[in-house]
Structure formats: C-alpha cells, structure tokens
C-alpha cells in the first residue's frame, strides 16, 4: 500500500487492556485539588486529537495540544496543568525532554513521556525531571488513560 492509499485513514486501536477511570472519579479528585488539567504535547496531529478525545472522555481537562516545545512552555505558563503527556521527538529544534526540563524547573510540572524512542540514553536524559511514567508508542487509548490516572494518583500521594 502506498502512502497515498493510506492517506485519509487513521486508527489507534484501543483494546480493553485496562478500563479508563470513570469520569466521576476524575471529578472527585478535581473537587479536592482543583481541575485536573493534562497538557498534551504531540506533533502528530491525529495522535494529539485521539489523545485529547480519550482524556476528555475519561474526565480530564485537556490543555493543548502543543506541537512544539515552545508552545508547550507557553501553554503551561497560561493554564498551569497538573501534568503533561510529552512526546519526545517534536516538530521544533527543542525536543520533548528539553521542554520537560523547562516545565519542571519553571512550573514544577512533571511529565509522562509518550515515545517510540524508549532507550536507556533517552531515559537517562529525562530522569532529572522526575518522569511520572513512560508510555511506549504505539499505545492504546485505554493504556494512555490508565497511565495518566496512575500519575494523578502518584501526585496525590506526593504533592
């Protein structure tokens, strides 16, 4: 199949590997700590839209998506998200780890890294910025929501 034949169709299958948290649970957490905002940083528009839909359906407020490190930092400064789902390879000169560094240092925002580049070197570069998790691509939307819910639970345990 040529790229032209594949154009126009995109799917991220989401098998029932984990159940997303109910919207009521997200609202309960939100009532205690303010709105649960998730900054989505992803330069693939279709993945960003799927991510937004899945997180919104699970009861999270989505900020973004940002497609570059610069957009991510600007949005974080404006919206003060609870956490970020960060792609590492972005459409800018700065990568997601550099954006995560700035989010962590300037705003104390921690990230879940969603990436196909999950090697020891990459993890080592990200470790100083206290990752909340790693989501290897390709991932299901159910896995995404579960990892975000786990990250929120971790943040609740350690503010």
What is each residue range found by the language model?
Residues 1-37, 105, 142-159:
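Non-catalytic signal-transmission and effector/linker regions of two-component phosphorelay proteins
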Residues 42:
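Conserved acidic carboxylate
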Residues 49-57:
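Charged docking surfaces used in two-component/phosphorelay signaling
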Residues 52, 65-83, 91:
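Acidic, metal-coordinating helix/loop segments flanking the phosphotransfer/catalytic sites
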Residues 87-101:
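Conserved phosphotransfer microenvironments
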Residues 126-135:
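As written
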